[in-house]
């Protein structure tokens, strides 16, 4: 019996040794070395945000569009929807309520519109933010203009450059005309007069700067652009003050300047000088044009030609249907009341893209004026959703918009497919300015060969992980462990993110992994597509130089003193020659004298 027990013990010992050797050999394999976070950040401290940190950074708002459209449980936190989470079977939106710009990056087909933009527009409507969207296909206004107006009480405006006869209007002189009318009704209202002059200067500067640079970039030619800006300001004020309704638009400004370039009957004076000479010496239009009026004749012709060259782009019979009638875009209304503006850009006709750039520049500058009058900040947040901004030509002064608008409670959300699009349109420095001014970046879903994934992988940073090596001798295998750095997410991992999964980076916080569901799963539904009534080609009325001149004489000639000498005598002593009065003007002057 004892030998049997000894054999059993020996067998158990033998199998134990074999098992131990097997376990030891398994331990000393490369598969046993796991890439887990170790150390104290010796090679990088990058990590994803915890649930607690996410809750502290973002406001969690129950996402209930069905109730919102009935006017129930409307959210009060204004901001951008950057993620979602489910809790107790209920969907919550993660909202960044800070004053931020947000850069959205994703390849074509990743779901930028269906997963990100639609939930954001619905939320913007629910919390009452005014917003503007750019769109190349027209889907945004067809799906949301009607909902915003019907359920949320928004004023909506659609500027459709693809179908100008099915578009709302955008008269660039609207605010100038508005405040000029207030001043003409009450000449003691100096505030209205000042605002008319301010918006005239903004419009002129926007047009002259439409080439993407300001006058300081033109070197020796800077005078001509500065003077052309003054001439445009003066012409805009003349149109607003002396033309009847229906003729006060930007095309009339072009026609007036062109008419004033015609030769006059007075030697050494052109029509522009003679027209402004009929204004009182204290009239601001005369002052704005002073640089051009007090220069040599050839230089003045160059100034007027510079102004005309900037206005040439507006000469389009289709665009006139948008530019020459009532406006649907009002910066003051946009800032103070719930307003949605949809800009439709035709991909097949890039000659009209400059209008989008001008609308954005002018609206931005006018928003700054409203903000400054309100203590430097808007009461109601405003958001610009620039969808497909990478596929259209450069939006002039975009870098300036990103740099200065955030503190005014104006958020911009550019949506691009790759960094290469920004570099192409805005150059390396311009792209860096835009990227650096975006406090939030949301990205996911990249093409297999995307270089943007490499850039974003690097921007996420590195973490410290365990690595090691195995060496095996004849009898004694050994293992060596080290700490190395590893990207928080490699480019390959970013490229393989499932659709609807995104990474959100925010200034001052750790990045967040989140999901943005398809708009249908957010509870968003669309109704009948929004349509604008077809407007037949309307006849455009233009300003007339003779009409403006007669109106100036009617208002101001009674205040002018009679010249003491004849034009010929004044010419001999070097004085300014006077314009011969037409029969109509003589009758008008006689009437005015009789009335006196």
Map each language-model feature to its residues.
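General helical structural elements
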Residues: 51, 55, 467, 476, ...
């Amino acid at each position: 019996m004892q030998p049997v027990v000894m054999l059993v013990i020996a067998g158990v010992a033998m199998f134990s040794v074999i098992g131990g050797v097997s376990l030891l050999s398994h331990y000393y394999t490369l598969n046993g070395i796991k890439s887990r976070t170790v150390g104290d950040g010796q090679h990088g401290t990058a990590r994803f945000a915890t649930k607690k940190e996410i809750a502290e950074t973002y406001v969690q708002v129950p996402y209930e569009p069905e109730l919102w459209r009935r006017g129930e449980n409307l959210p009060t936190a204004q901001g951008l929807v950057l993620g979602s989470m489910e809790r107790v079977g209920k969907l919550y939106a993660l909202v960044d309520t800070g004053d931020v710009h947000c850069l959205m990056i994703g390849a074509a087909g990743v779901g930028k519109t269906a997963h990100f933009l639609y939930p954001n527009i619905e939320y913007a409507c629910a919390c009452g933010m005014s917003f503007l969207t750019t769109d190349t296909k027209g889907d945004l206004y067809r799906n949301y203009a009607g909902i915003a107006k019907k359920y949320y009480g928004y004023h909506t405006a659609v500027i459709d450059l693809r179908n100008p006869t099915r578009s709302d209007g955008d008269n660039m002189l609207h605010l100038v005309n508005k405040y000029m009318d207030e001043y003409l009704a009450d000449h003691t209202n100096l505030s209205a007069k000042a605002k008319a002059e301010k918006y005239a200067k903004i419009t002129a500067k926007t047009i002259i700067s439409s080439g993407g640079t300001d006058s300081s970039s033109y070197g020796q030619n800077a005078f001509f652009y500065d003077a052309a800006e003054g001439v445009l300001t003066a012409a805009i004020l003349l149109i607003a003050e002396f033309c009847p309704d229906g003729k006060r638009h930007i095309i009339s400004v072009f026609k007036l300047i062109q008419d004033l370039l015609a030769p006059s009957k007075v030697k050494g004076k052109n029509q522009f000088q003679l027209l402004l000479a009929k204004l009182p010496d204290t009239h601001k239009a005369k002052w704005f044009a002073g640089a051009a009026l007090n220069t040599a004749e050839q230089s003045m012709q160059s100034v007027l030609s510079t102004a005309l060259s900037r206005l040439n782009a507006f000469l389009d019979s289709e665009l006139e249907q948008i530019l020459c009638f009532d406006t649907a875009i009002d910066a003051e209304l946009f800032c103070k009341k719930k307003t949605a503006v949809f800009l439709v850009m035709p991909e097949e006709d890039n000659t009209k893209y400059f209008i989008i750039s001008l609308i954005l520049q002018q609206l931005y500058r006018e928003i700054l004026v409203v903000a400054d009058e309100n203590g430097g900040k808007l009461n109601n947040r405003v958001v610009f959703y620039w969808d497909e901004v990478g596929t259209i030509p450069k939006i002039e002064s975009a870098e300036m918009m990103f740099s200065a608008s955030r503190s005014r409670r104006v958020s911009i959300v550019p949506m691009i497919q790759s960094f290469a699009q920004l570099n192409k349109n805005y150059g390396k420095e311009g792209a860096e300015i835009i990227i650096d001014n975006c406090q939030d970046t949301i990205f996911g879903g990249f093409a297999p060969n995307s270089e943007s994934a490499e850039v974003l992988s690097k921007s996420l940073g590195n973490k410290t992980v365990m690595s090691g090596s195995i060496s095996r001798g004849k009898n004694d295998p050994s293992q060596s462990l080290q700490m190395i750095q590893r990207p928080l997410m490699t480019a390959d991992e970013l490229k393989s993110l499932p659709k609807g999964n995104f990474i959100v980076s925010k200034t001052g916080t750790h990045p967040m992994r989140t999901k943005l569901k398809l708009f249908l799963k957010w509870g968003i539904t669309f109704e009948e597509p929004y349509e604008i009534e077809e407007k037949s080609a309307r006849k455009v009325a233009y300003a007339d130089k003779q009409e403006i001149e007669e109106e100036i004489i009617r208002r101001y000639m009674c205040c002018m003193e009679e010249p003491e000498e004849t034009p010929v005598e004044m010419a001999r002593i070097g004085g300014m020659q006077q314009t011969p009065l037409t029969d109509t003007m003589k009758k008008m002057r006689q009437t005015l004298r009789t009335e006196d």
